[in-house]
């Protein structure tokens, strides 16, 4: 899946993701860099309204994104990005919405 394909699919389902609590969604990793292979997963992180997201809601967002993209996803909140990698991830991420 190309970067543009992933972004297009996610944007078409922006309302669904927002209903689940996603305020802003970002693509990073191999798909964002245009280096994804057929077996690559899609890496995403998102911002959400504080106090509105628990484990079950996070799983709902992950399942929705995987269904939209038709492939495995690694999805996390911005707050859960590894502190040693956060600056690099944020600098190279592509904002989806």
Regions of interest found by a model, annotated:
Residues 44-45, 69:
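General secondary-structure edge motif
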Residues 1-24, 32-38, 50-97:
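Catalytic core of pol beta-like nucleotidyltransferases
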Residues 38-39, 44:
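A short, structured beta-strand/loop element
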């Amino acid at each position: 899946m190309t970067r543009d394909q992933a972004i297009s699919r996610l944007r078409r389902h922006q309302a669904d993701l927002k209903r689940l609590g996603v305020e802003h969604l970002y693509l990073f990793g191999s798909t964002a860099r245009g280096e994804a292979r057929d077996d690559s997963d899609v890496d995403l992180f998102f911002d959400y309204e504080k106090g509105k997201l628990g484990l079950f809601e996070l799983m709902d967002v992950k399942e929705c994104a995987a269904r939209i993209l038709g492939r495995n996803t690694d999805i996390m909140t911005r707050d859960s990005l590894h502190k040693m990698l956060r600056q690099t991830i944020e600098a190279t991420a592509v904002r989806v919405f």
